[in-house]
Amino acid sequence: MKRKIYIRMTLVSVIMMLFTMSVTVFTFYNLFSEQVMEDLKTHVHILNTTEAVLQYVEKDFDPKIDNLRITVIDTKGDVLYDSNADIGTMDNHVNRPEIKEALEHGHGEATRKSDTLDKTTYYYAEKLENGQVLRVAKEVVSVWQFIFKILPI
């Protein structure tokens, strides 16, 4: 009888511990995701105040140091500059959600797996005064990678 009680109590404890850990991890991951998007907005606003954005990113920006991807897109969706990929191989971006939103409403955001880089990426885009769109992106780990990273294994 004592053995059955011990096994059930252990099982309940393990289930509760896993539940608590899951809720905690997903809560922190959501907070982390929100912070990433806020950081991207800040980067876009700072770059948008730079007079010659395209000249700055081509000359002074280093994606390895800044850990960001910057893309400049014209009003037709053609990529004028990308810090991480060859623009000659890139598709037209006019139908990307964040670009559509930026062209229509002045700014847009999205989270998706990047076709170009094959990674999960957060995107924030803002329409510049000249009509072009400045998009900043950051790669992030998935929630599963996040979980395995914090586990003591």
Question: Model regions: which residues?
Answer:
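Membrane-proximal, non-catalytic sensory/regulatory domains of signal-transducing membrane proteins
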Residues: 64, 89-130
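Extracytoplasmic/secreted envelope proteins and their assembly/folding machinery
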Residues: 41, 96-99, 140
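Short, hydrophobic beta-strand elements of compact beta-sandwich sensory domains
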Residues: 122-147
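Short, well-structured alpha-helical patches and their helix-loop capping segments
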Residues: 94, 115, 135-138, 147, ...
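A structural microfeature
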Residues: 80-81, 132
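Juxtamembrane segments flanking the first transmembrane helix
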Residues: 1-78, 84-91, 104, 145, ...
